[in-house]
Curated annotation (Swiss-Prot):
It comes from the Bacteria. This is Protein nucleotidyltransferase YdiU. It comes from Burkholderia orbicola (strain MC0-3). GO terms for molecular function: AMPylase activity; ATP binding; magnesium ion binding. Transmembrane segments: none annotated.
Length: 522
């Protein structure tokens, strides 16, 4: 179904949109059966209103931008449909399990997220739409099923910012707010963010059926993921081993991209890892400002398990958890009659796949860092040069984003042009020593300074979602002023462009930003 993009027809789009979202034939995950989910309506959200809307995601879903101005839009995406949901079209919450902070947590599930259906994308793919903050579900445990305005704005902005940085991610169509109070560390207001992704299947979905000794359901889930998202795995000698490899390699690529832009996820539990290798579950995330390899963005992470430098190791560990969950399926095609022999071979095969994570991650990060340094040619010492820069930045707490962006101003032959980036370092002599090494390396390049600068500015964003920028937008939104949410979203659509009229958004964080804390409370 294609929706009209004209403003005049936007009102007529809403009923068709609601019907299409609920079409049972299109909701592939639901067809897996009741063991995978629970269907239930969203909890009504009183007097909802639109806080933020992504034209880009609307275009992806072939929705007219004017649809957000229609009165029924906020109702629909608050989980307050204007018609009764028929039983076959009821939203659903899925069940999964997982490891949280390295400890087995048992059954978890969508405690405040409800998938309301899927829509065809203009890119030929199909996308599920999920309401985060839609109310209590059977998996809410002690939670109230709500999300707050603060965290919903952060997820909305960062989902779209990451996409425009070129990093695989779930998307966000809209944020719907309300004046309904919810209790967190203080009284806040409820909101709903509409997540958009090809799939919300996590490592934890596989762990759930493995831990419950349901190889039949585990296989059903794996077949669903393979057939819909990894069809090439079906032709492999062992489709389930191929699935593990594909997910492992995508995860390695993803985390390399995180590291390259200074992104910290904050809560890399196995239930927060996408089987598609995309960034999912934006909670206590953060972009590193003053660089610290041990930076912890999540105030709740007292052990530093998910610190910046730990992210590759944790991602690899999470892939081991996925491998364990898939072991009952690996090797089934080999026809080994003896269960112990099959299990032993499955372990060996899985370990061989998992060994590919560092083999994939290392070169991926090296390529990213080479691009950030403007090095078109590959040389043996490039990784050491990049690591030396990070060490120098760490020692001086130099700003991550500004340092890499300003490196483009360095000249092969003129050290006097170093000042903009040099001024970011406390230890100027240490920077000078590194800059001399860098200039020597640049002398091996064939591009001139101007061409290199253009390439570097395509690899090093000028604008990222710093915590203080999000905080300003959140504070204004609490006063019903959503202009800063819109302005920030527009700036972050073009993170690599100069945008001189928005120079203040690329500046060093103000002193008060140092007191900001984000945690798992959302």
């Amino acid at each position: 179904m294609s929706f009209s993009r004209s403003a005049a027809d936007a009102a007529d789009t809403l009923p068709d949109l609601a019907a299409t979202l609920g079409a049972p034939a299109e909701r592939a995950f639901v067809t897996l059966g009741d063991a995978f989910h629970t269907r239930l309506p969203a909890a009504p959200l009183a007097a909802p209103y639109v806080v933020g809307f992504s034209d880009d995601v609307a275009q992806l879903l072939d929705l007219p931008p004017a649809i957000a101005a229609q009165p029924g839009f906020a109702e629909l995406f608050a989980g307050n449909p204007t018609r009764d949901w028929p039983a076959h079209a009821m939203p659903y919450a899925s069940v999964y399990s997982g490891h949280q902070f390295g400890v087995w947590a048992g059954q978890l599930g969508d405690g405040r997220a409800l998938t309301i259906g899927e829509l065809p994308g203009t890119d030929g793919r199909r996308y599920e739409l999920q309401l985060k903050g839609g109310g209590r579900t059977p998996y809410s445990r002690m939670g109230d099923g709500r999300a707050v305005l603060r965290s919903s704005i952060r997820e909305f902005l960062c989902s779209e910012a990451m996409h425009h940085l070129g990093i695989p991610t779930t998307r966000a169509l809209t944020v719907i707010g309300s004046d309904q109070p919810v209790v967190r560390e203080e009284i806040e207001t409820a909101a709903v963010v509409t997540r958009v992704s090809e799939s919300f299947v996590r490592f934890g979905h596989f762990e759930h059926f493995f831990s419950n000794d349901r190889p039949d359901l585990l296989r059903q889930l794996a077949d669903h993921v393979i057939d819909r998202f990894y069809p090439a795995c079906r032709d492999a000698d062992d489709p389930y081993l191929a699935l593990l490899e594909a997910a492992t390699l995508r995860t390695a690529d993803l985390v390399a991209q995180w590291q390259a832009v200074g992104f910290c996820h904050g809560v890399m539990n196995t239930d927060n890892m996408s089987i598609l290798g995309v960034t999912i579950d934006y909670g206590p995330f953060g972009f590193v400002d003053a660089f610290d390899a041990n930076h912890i963005c999540n105030h709740s992470d007292t052990s530093g398990r998910y610190a910046y430098r730990m992210q590759p190791r944790i991602a690899h560990w999470n892939c081991y958890c996925l491998a364990q969950a898939l072991l009952p399926l690996i090797g089934l095609q080999h026809g080994i009659a003896d269960d112990d022999a099959r299990a032993e071979r499955a372990v060996d095969d899985a370990q061989a796949v998992l060994a590919k994570f560092p083999e994939r991650f290392g070169p991926a990060l090296e390529r990213a860092m080479r691009a950030k340094l403007g090095l078109a040619l590959e040389r043996e010492g490039d990784a050491e040069l990049a690591n030396k820069l990070l060490e120098t930045m760490h020692a001086s707490h130099a700003d991550f984003t500004l340092t890499f962006r300003r490196l483009a101003q360095i000249s092969k032959h003129d050290a006097s042009r170093d000042a903009p980036v040099r001024d970011l370092f406390i230890d100027r002599e240490a920077f000078d020593a590194w800059a001399n090494l860098y200039r020597a390396r640049l002398s091996e390049e064939t591009r001139d300074d101007a061409a290199r600068a253009v390439a570097m500015n395509r690899a090093n964003p000028k604008y990222v979602l710093r915590n203080h920028l999000a905080e300003v937008a959140i504070r204004r939104a609490k006063e019903k002023d959503f202009s800063e949410v819109e302005r920030l979203a527009q700036i972050l659509r073009r993170p690599f462009d100069e945008q001189p009229e928005h120079e203040a958004y690329a500046a060093l964080p103000p002193d008060w930003a140092g007191s900001l804390e984000v945690s798992c409370s959302s």
